UniProtKB/Swiss-Prot annotation:
GO molecular function: mRNA binding; structural constituent of ribosome
Name of the protein in its database record: Large ribosomal subunit protein bL12
Cellular component terms per the entry's GO annotation: cytosolic large ribosomal subunit
Coiled-coil ranges (or none): none
Source organism (scientific name): Heliobacterium modesticaldum (strain ATCC 51547 / Ice1)
Family listed: Belongs to the bacterial ribosomal protein bL12 family.
Lineage: Bacteria, Bacillati, Bacillota, Clostridia, Eubacteriales
Amino acid sequence: MSKINEIIEAVKGLTVLELAELVKAFEEEFGVSAAAPVAMAAMPVAAAAAAPAEEQTEFDVILKAAGDKKVNVIKVVREITGLGLKEAKDLVDGAPKPVKEKVSKEEAESIKKKLEESGATVEVK
């Protein structure tokens, strides 16, 4: 039997705990890490998988159209943004335009609900 076959036979007879100790001994003896090559190979896959998993935290509320009740929409836009009458009217007339940007999901949904109740068409991005 060759030396390699003897080593393989010896490794086959080891328990999991003994194998873990063997790996640790190899790492210390030769100054290498058994985990590094595996982690480096897996990292691009993990990074690609993690990107879509990130949840969006900031949302923009976009007024798509004012609808039939433009006056009501202007009132709600003024209430939400704190704009003056002319600025709110210009925003509504210039639709599609952002009403609020970089707000939380809850706030975006609340604004969307208010605007839709007033007759507007709204999108949250």
